């Protein structure tokens, strides 16, 4: 895992919330002892500000460890409750950028599937709606740009913008693979990818209302990963 400075990750902070650009390769929360993650690093950051007090940090949503992008954390239980309400009521905007090597027939579209998580393998798959444990997953995608790259099986990389309607486990990775557009660098859902590129997925845009004053908060980041290099539209 890469080393990182949590101070460099913080995009915004006030008494209620903390917004970060999570680096790829860093877990939001880790079960491994001694492994740096966003939660422990941010708690250490907060503890330095209030010595002697146990800092509160509410995890509102997550990104897979190999995924980079914007995350919001709550600094009070009240802020956490309000942000969770916005997540549940689908008033939070989440946009992603992804990279694939497969160009779909439709340059834009809506994907709707049912996914089931397998806790034993930490993976999800597309199943029938009546499968026990199945959860509806939907997203919208649109092709942004295509560039040449001899490292991929098709000789190209394709940038895709994705707007999430739901937030299921590994949703984008699973739905895109099922559609025939597996993400580059995805070791779990793209078995045919022989490139050494890291996972091409970034949470690039997050918008919500401030839990205390209702002000619209909007954050955008540019992906830093190798898989995104060369695209002019970033």
Predicted segments with their positions:
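RNA pseudouridine synthases
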Residues: 1-234
